[in-house]
Amino acid sequence: MTITQMISEILMHNTVYNYILSLISIILFIVIGKYANALIERLADKLHKKSGIELDELLIRALSLPVAIAIILSGFYFGVNFLYLLPSLKTAVNEGILTAFILCVVVFFDRFLNELVERYLALTISKKTKKDVDDQIVVLTKKLVRLVVWVVGLLLILSNLGYDIKTLLAGLGIGGLAVALASQNLVSNLIAGLIILTDKPFKIGNWITFSGGSGIVEDIGIRSTKIRATDNSIIVVPNSKLIDEIIQNVPSKNKWKVSTTIGVTYNTPVEKIRKAEEIIKNILLEHPNVEDEPITVYFKEFGDWSLNIQVVYYIKNSRYNGYQKYISTINEVNLKIKEEFDRKGIEFAFPTYTLYLKRDD
């Protein structure tokens, strides 16, 4: 075998000129795709500023990425066709490129419909009902739309790969009973999720207590509900089980109650007890995470080894990182009380006992 023949075998019977044309085609279309993406984004911005028509803007923005990828895929398609490939390899490459084109279309509909739901569903219903749409309804609708789009996309891809969709659907019909039995839990969880959304025993951001624990509801999904527990862990509860629970719900828990007792020594004079109450109240009033009202600080009782000052206050809650905010606020308040008491010479009490020893002479 001559050197020329060896090189020809290595290059799969393509000339260097063929490879250069293929590479130029791919690079050229990558550059065009990049600029097309930027151009479409600028067009969307300009359209929004001029007309303020959000639907057109959504459509164009949703097109930007899929169009850019489609242009780049076109470059690969033309690049491959500049080369001589084995028929089976060429067919496989072309099928792969066509599959990627279908994915671009799926991504477009996924982006466009989800943005449409995000922007217009809440606005449309709120105009009719004069109230905001619950966040979880929008989230659930987006998930369902995404599921439908990707299922249709998967069927198109399978059809492109040579599978008979009618046969597949018929097979699903024959095995429908088995699928129904296997998906019984999924269906029951889906129905339970819809019951939670419509009946509204709780909403995202509510604090609930049930047999499995307690915490803030972070997400109500198709299959399960996610609850942020007090130790910052996530409890995932199937919806079908949750609706059978006895749930204690504080729907307006926008604050956390803190009740604590601070003991000072028995030799603390009355003036310093009053000063201690004043210090604690000022610290709570000045902290940004503490509700201004109600704050309760009072001399509660004469304890076994301390004069007890009762402190009750409320920490503002937030939908996200609520528990972290709760513990960090308590930490900051307690450190500040310790610092101020030390500075004013107010002593904390600790368990002490006085022993009287009687000596028999």
UniProtKB/Swiss-Prot annotation:
Domain of life of the native organism: Archaea
GO process terms (BP): monoatomic ion transmembrane transport
One GO location term (cellular component): plasma membrane
Topology with respect to the bilayer: Multi-pass membrane protein
PROSITE patterns: UPF0003
Keywords: Cell membrane, Ion channel, Ion transport, Membrane, Transmembrane, Transmembrane helix, Transport
Subcellular location(s) of the protein: Cell membrane
Entry's family note: Belongs to the MscS (TC 1.A.23) family.
Chain's role: Large-conductance mechanosensitive channel that opens in response to stretch forces in the membrane lipid bilayer. Selective for cations. Rectifies with voltage.
Protein name: Large-conductance mechanosensitive channel MscMJLR
The organism of origin for this protein: Methanocaldococcus jannaschii (strain ATCC 43067 / DSM 2661 / JAL-1 / JCM 10045 / NBRC 100440) (Methanococcus jannaschii)
